[in-house]
Amino acid sequence: MQAILDEFDEYLALQCGRSVHTRRAYLGDLRSLFAFLADRGSSLDALTLSVLRSWLAATAGAGAARTTLARRTSAVKAFTAWAVRRGLLAGDPAARLQVPKARRTLPAVLRQDQALRAMAAAESGAEQGDPLALRDRLIVELLYATGIRVSELCGLDVDDIDTGHRLVRVLGKGNKQRTVPFGQPAADALHAWLVDGRRALVTAESGHALLLGARGRRLDVRQARTAVHQTVAAVDGAPDMGPHGLRHSAATHLLEGGADLRVVQELLGHSSLATTQLYTHVAVARLRAVHERAHPRA
């Protein structure tokens, strides 16, 4: 089974352009399915729609969230379609399997004043010129300024940054490339990092990576999450959040400032406008909360 998983993983990476995070999740889902088959004394050849439904029912019975069920369904549908093309399955048992709709919840976002305080905290922490503090300042500034995903941030190379025009070239989901602008505060953080931070950490293993870990290798997602969590935690009253929370906040603040929905969609790299529209609900919900607190006849 491992050889099959390795080949499927290669297909997801090279032909589908799936991210490392998605591929890891899909392979974990398939290992769960294979273990379920083994417990029943079955093999891949015995995979049927009924078996898949039983597996998903067992997953739900174990307390899995609807988002997990939706992802597992997507994973197995992608796998069985590929397996049919590879001749590993005679027919596609998942063709009629419905992907459950994940219940959308409004993401936690920072208020604009909280976001500014978080950026100020990161800037203050970098005043002594510590390379890691300079890096962490750039992490939060770029994430909030551009709204890019943390995986996209960690994948950036130095050459992806156009400092003169304050633009960053991003390789997003499905290997789709987009260009996102950033403002002067992020440009200042970038300059400080390139001049005083990166040079102190760069090694032969650094390559062209923009952001580096303490040992000079390309920064990983886990380290970036830690930097964001610690920075936001310094802001009184701010919700606990990681990089995706800064992405949510950037999108919400753009819309609150009057940005066009389709422009925000392009900046975030959303393939569907419906995904971006979630942030309009966040903005409206925040306006309603302010109205209810402040208006005498709310």
Curated annotation (Swiss-Prot):
The keyword DNA-binding applies. CDD domains: INT_XerDC_C. Residues 105-292 form the Tyr recombinase domain. The active site is at residues 149, 173, 244, 247, 270, 279. One of its GO terms (molecular function) is site-specific recombinase activity. Residues 1-84 form the Core-binding (CB) domain. Keywords: Cell cycle, Cell division, Chromosome partition, Cytoplasm, DNA integration, DNA recombination, DNA-binding. The keyword Hydrolase does not apply. It is found in: Cytoplasm. GO terms for biological process: cell division; chromosome segregation; DNA recombination; DNA transposition. InterPro entries: CB, DNA_brk_join_enz, Integrase-like_cat_sf, Integrase_catalytic, Integrase_recombinase_N, Integrase_SAM-like_N, Tyrosine_recombinase_XerC/XerD, Tyrosine_recombinase_XerCD. Transmembrane segments: none annotated. Signal peptide: none annotated. Pfam families: Phage_int_SAM_1, Phage_integrase. SUPFAM superfamilies: DNA breaking-rejoining enzymes. GO terms for cellular component: cytoplasm; plasma membrane. Site-specific tyrosine recombinase, which acts by catalyzing the cutting and rejoining of the recombining DNA molecules. The XerC-XerD complex is essential to convert dimers of the bacterial chromosome into monomers to permit their segregation at cell division. It also contributes to the segregational stability of plasmids. Belongs to the 'phage' integrase family. XerC subfamily. This is Tyrosine recombinase XerC.
